[in-house]
Structure formats: structure tokens, C-alpha cells
Amino acid sequence: METQGVMKEIQYEEFEEKIIEIRRTSKVTKGGKNLSFRVVAIVGNKNGKVGLGIGKAREVPEAIRKAISAAKRNIVEVPVINGTIPHEVIGRQDASKVLLKPAAPGTGIIAGGTVRAVVELAGIQNILTKSLGSTNPLNLALATMNGLKNLLDPRKVAKLRDISVEEVFKGVRRENNA
């Protein structure tokens, strides 16, 4: 039983953590205002795995711990091919939209603060992004995660269609050149 807990801890050690937002919130009650904190955190291994978590607590360190723990439970696998994403995708969350486009090697990460944090920890080195609509950090992070979740791995697409991976990419290039 204990070995399972140890294995999980070892698995989590490779993840890098970033705090995106720390927000002070208050609840007004009969006895006055109850202050608490909301933290948005991102974890990733810079090799195709990234997670987002939200933590709430009366103290900042406790909220950070909860956010990181939640992020480790919500890990998503991202298909990264030659340091970029396989195709263009739009992620949406409430009033926020994030456009994610693959980029040529050497382009780097063209992204704002929140989107940049998510993309860096996912292990993407070349990408073009554009944030549209609301710039709320939580919604931008969630929109980016939704976009990354919707990416299709070319190997899986090729297997489903019973064609080679090269043929999948030929179709993409033909559409872009037309």
C-alpha cells in the first residue's frame, strides 16, 4: 500500500510548477468579511504533459499546495512534433479564445504571459498564439488547455484512417497551399 504512494511521488517529482495567479477573495457575512485566496497553478514536464489546477484556502501557501496538487491530478498529454503542435486549433473558455498555430523551427514561443506558461510547460518550443476576447488569466489558461486537449496526434489519425503518417501530413500541406 505504501509503495503506491511512493511511486506517485516519484512520478510527480519530474514536473515543473508555475503559479499563474494569486487572487484575494472575500465573502461578506454577518460577522464581517472572510478573506481567502485563490491560486491558479500549472505543472508540466516539458515533454508533452501539462496540467492546470485551482486551489482555494485562507492562507496563500495552503492555496498554492492545493492548486499544485489539483494540477497534478488534471494532467493532459499534448502531441508535440518537432517542437511544435501538429495542427492549428482554437481553445475556448467562457469569453476567452486562444488561437494556437504550429510554427517553423526557430520561431520560438509567440504568446502572452498565461498562454506562454502553459505552452512552455507542455514542452512546445515553436508556436504562434493569439488571445482573443477576455484576458482573465484563469479563463485564458483553461482555453489554452482546452485547445491542447483538442489536438489530434497524427499517428492516431493515421491508424484510424488506415493510412501512413506522411499521407496525413500531405493532406494538411495541400489544404494550406490551396
Curated annotation (Swiss-Prot):
It comes from the Bacteria. One of its GO terms (molecular function) is structural constituent of ribosome. With S4 and S12 plays an important role in translational accuracy. Belongs to the universal ribosomal protein uS5 family. The gene is rpsE. This is Small ribosomal subunit protein uS5. The keyword Thylakoid does not apply. One of its GO terms (biological process) is translation. Keywords: Ribonucleoprotein, Ribosomal protein, RNA-binding, rRNA-binding. GO terms for cellular component: cytosolic small ribosomal subunit. Part of the 30S ribosomal subunit. Contacts proteins S4 and S8. Residues 15-78 form the S5 DRBM domain. The N-terminal domain interacts with the head of the 30S subunit; the C-terminal domain interacts with the body and contacts protein S4. The interaction surface between S4 and S5 is involved in control of translational fidelity. It comes from Thermotoga maritima (strain ATCC 43589 / DSM 3109 / JCM 10099 / NBRC 100826 / MSB8). InterPro entries: Ribosomal_Su5_D2-typ_SF, Ribosomal_uS5, Ribosomal_uS5_bac-type, Ribosomal_uS5_C, Ribosomal_uS5_N, Ribosomal_uS5_N_CS, Ribsml_uS5_D2-typ_fold_subgr. It holds the Pfam family Ribosomal_S5.
